[in-house]
Curated annotation (Swiss-Prot):
PROSITE patterns: TRP_SYNTHASE_BETA. This is Tryptophan synthase beta chain. Signal peptide: none annotated. The keyword Lyase applies. Its EC number is 4.2.1.20. Coiled coil: none annotated. NCBIfam families: trpB (TIGR00263). It catalyses: (1S,2R)-1-C-(indol-3-yl)glycerol 3-phosphate + L-serine = D-glyceraldehyde 3-phosphate + L-tryptophan + H2O. Belongs to the TrpB family. It is an enzyme of class 4 (lyase). GO terms for molecular function: tryptophan synthase activity. The modification N6-(pyridoxal phosphate)lysine is found at residue 86.
């Protein structure tokens, strides 16, 4: 029996080998007690404020919306220590690991941002850290790989399958199956077996809480919509959580359409996948007609994931959130537009959410509306990827 509900409607659950059930139960119990422990909460809040740099800014775009009646705000998770929203929840999970008496952290990473966040939290709190990363992603994200190693983490290349995030997830779970007595698996997104989707949401929900308070202070009202990119879905659920019960606020999640949905080269399982069991949960995923997990694709390593967190699947099923998709090229255009017009270089992941916001503004330039894009990370890690693409096109 679990203390918390392991499902969001029909989605979620704990589809793991029996050997891992005690570890998940221990984690749930530690999380529930920590949420009620003022000392734990005070330590977590202190780290968020004085180490990570919260609250993060809410920035009004001065130039991107000229000639329209839209106010476009960016929630600046790119300013967080570590460069992305990932730092929020790893600090919480690292404190939980210490509370459970664990001495080691296992993590997986795609774009490398969760790996960097895990490495910095472990360095700070004195935990050993080993990080599984697809060999293809190691090539795409060499600056982040060096950052992880610089902070003392062991980075383990994964060559199986497509050598990307899903394969790193599989290897990390395999490792944890044999080491859970001393190691905590620091899952990087709001997916996987219960209680991870709930833990990650709660350790990210300050994004939306701060946004709500900042909007009321700046505008005297809530935004018309908040937008966030969707890979596994942690930055989005962190933004959405505090707005779910605000019916006047639209929730828009943006999946990667890659080379185009019609090509099959995408990472948009919410709208174009089928429900199945993968990575310890029941959720929509990209799969073949005979049920094999299909390879996802995105220009952005952090969105290159064939499934999605179960709470997003639920919000989609009840119509509370809208999920759309944006192609590589549209994300690249948004990446360039924000860099050129506002002096902010966004992560390619975040550029997907920005691209859809810009499409909304272009479609109705006379509409008076306030939009907030969760700028989930900074684009330093992506400049080499973007440089190579633009050079190949003759644009630079």
């Amino acid at each position: 029996m679990t203390t918390l509900n392991p499902y969001f409607g029909e989605f979620g659950g704990m589809y793991v080998p029996q050997i891992l059930m005690p570890a998940l139960k221990q984690l749930e119990e530690a999380f529930v007690s920590a949420q009620l422990d003022p000392e734990f909460q005070a330590e977590f809040q202190d780290l968020l404020k004085n180490y990570a740099g919260r609250p993060t800014a809410l920035t009004l775009c001065q130039n991107l919306t000229k000639g329209t009646k839209t106010k476009l705000y960016l929630k600046r998770e790119d300013l967080l220590h570590g460069g992305a929203h990932k730092t929020n929840q790893v600090l919480g999970q690292a404190l939980l690991a210490k509370r459970m008496g664990k001495t080691e952290i296992i993590a997986e990473t795609g774009a490398g941002q969760h790996g960097v966040a895990s490495a910095l939290a472990c360095a700070l709190l004195g935990l050993k850290c080993r990080i599984y990363m697809g060999a293809k992603d190691i090539e795409r994200q060499s600056p982040n790989v060096f950052r992880m190693r610089l902070m003392g983490a062991e980075v383990i290349p994964v060559h199986s399958g497509s050598s990307t995030l899903k394969d790193a997830c599989n290897e990390a779970l395999r490792d944890w199956s044999g080491s859970y007595e001393t190691a905590h698996y620091m899952l990087g997104t709001a997916a996987g077996p219960h209680p991870y989707p709930t833990i990650v949401r709660e350790f990210q929900r300050m994004i939306g809480e701060e946004t709500k308070a900042q909007m009321l202070a700046r505008e005297g009202r809530l935004p018309d919509a908040v937008l966030a990119c969707i890979g596994g879905g942690s930055n989005a659920i962190g933004m959405f959580a505090d707005f779910i019960d605000e019916p006047g606020v639209g929730l828009i999640g943006v999946e990667p359409a890659g080379l185009g949905i019609e090509t099959g080269q995408h990472g948009a399982p919410l709208k174009h996948g089928k429900v199945g069991i993968y990575f310890g949960m029941k959720s929509p995923m990209m799969q073949t007609s005979d049920g094999q997990i299909e390879e996802s694709y995105s220009i952005s390593a952090g969105l290159d994931f064939p499934s999605v967190g179960p709470q997003h699947a639920y919000l989609n099923s009840i119509g509370r959130a809208d999920y759309v998709s944006v192609t590589d090229d549209e994300a690249l255009d948004a990446f360039k537009a924000l860099s050129c017009n506002e002096g902010i270089i966004p992560a390619l992941e975040s550029s997907h959410a920005l691209a859809h916001a810009l499409k909304m503004i272009k479609a109705e330039p006379e509409k008076e509306q306030i939009l907030v894009v969760n700028l989930s990370g900074r684009g330093d890690k992506d400049i080499f990827t973007v440089h190579d693409i633009l050079k190949a096109r003759g644009e630079i």
